[in-house]
Amino acid sequence: MPPAQPRWTMSGPPNSPSHSEYVRLLTMGSRFDVSGVQCNGVSGLAAQVHTQDNFRAVAWRDGAVVLIDQTRLPHEETWLTLRNPDDVAHAIRTMQVRGAPAIGVAGAGGVALAAYEWDAQDTRMLIMHIAMRAEELRATRPTAVNLGWAIDRMMRVARSAAPDGPAALRAALAAEVEVIADEDRAQSERIAAFGAPLMPAGGILTHCNTGALVTAGGDGTALAVIRAAWRQGTSLHVYADETRPRLQGARLTMWDLQRWGIPSTLIADGAAASLMRRGLIQAVIVGADRIAANGDTANKIGTYSAALAAHAHNIPFYVAAPRSTFDTTIPHGDAIPIEERAAEELTEIGGVRIAPEGIAVANPAFDVTPAAYITAIITDTGILRFPYTEPVRAAADRDQTLVHVSAGY
């Protein structure tokens, strides 16, 4: 549970923002240098979305997107209240919010905020403005399809509400963000229920972070399956890859597992195959950022390596993701756009350079695991088995069709 009163520590220079100024700027969604200020407490809108049993990494509250800054975990729990699309885009791009379902909810909130930032009475002009802002949000993370899915859904709602005028349009968008978040929570629970029986006793390897931080409620995707199995009495031990270069496994997955009290061990990315050979791993389960029509799956860089190792050792490899992660407009994994991130993520750690200057750096954020290496896809409608083309199509058909929205009316 959050503390009754916020706890603060000040270690910055004399001209650092005061406590009250920090709260004011944070509430307004402003961005400034907070390297010398730590907010370890929970207050205001953030308190509405943070309890031990009902943790929400991202939520829509009182006309704002409220989210936990994942870049500061595990050392600080800093909650951000964002009131304009630029701040939402910044949060997505810099991975203050991450995880495909979570950035979908955040992106939906950004679209709703776009409707409120311009007091236009001409509905056509307002729609054009919202669509322009929606495309800016879409461009922040090109691989995760949930972001585009949520943005497209919000634009359909905007167009549908347009005949009723600007006020009705804004209200409809705000309501839809909450609907998407509620659906996300329900999907997490169903994924956990379907997947838990697949988890064997023994060692479970996971990669990146797929817990409560990646959804708008519930326990996430792959980690939700693990937690459900553990709660049902399965004697398991989680091995979490550190997940270079952003260390989501070390910083975030271990944070989730420690909070939940699940037995777990952090390992280097390169150690997974060795543990498999020693018989310490009985299953692998990961999340997904985009699943193509044939089941090829894009996920955090290093996932493909884990799948290859699992295949070589005859260990089941599972993917857990909601239907919004399916993209039937993409026939196979080779067509999935792969985000290339900044070289500094590899050449620096904590702002300290660890590699020589002037070197070439490749930093793809994701890789693609071919469907043939995936034992099953656990989704909110059930368990899908190889070959995946028909099961993926059937599951995707139960959701709204992806329609790319241009910046026009």
Describe each model-derived feature in a short phrase.
Residues 9-20, 30:
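Intrinsically disordered, low-complexity segments enriched in small polar residues
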Residues 44-86:
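Positively charged, low-complexity intrinsically disordered leader regions
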Residues 68, 106, 148-150, 205-209, ...:
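Short beta-strand segments
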Residues 80-96, 197-204, 348-358:
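Short, hydrophobic/aliphatic alpha-helical segments
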Residues 96-267:
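N-terminal active-site beta-alpha-beta segment that forms phosphate/nucleotide-binding
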Residues 235-236, 241-409:
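Conserved phosphate- and dinucleotide-binding cores of soluble alpha/beta proteins
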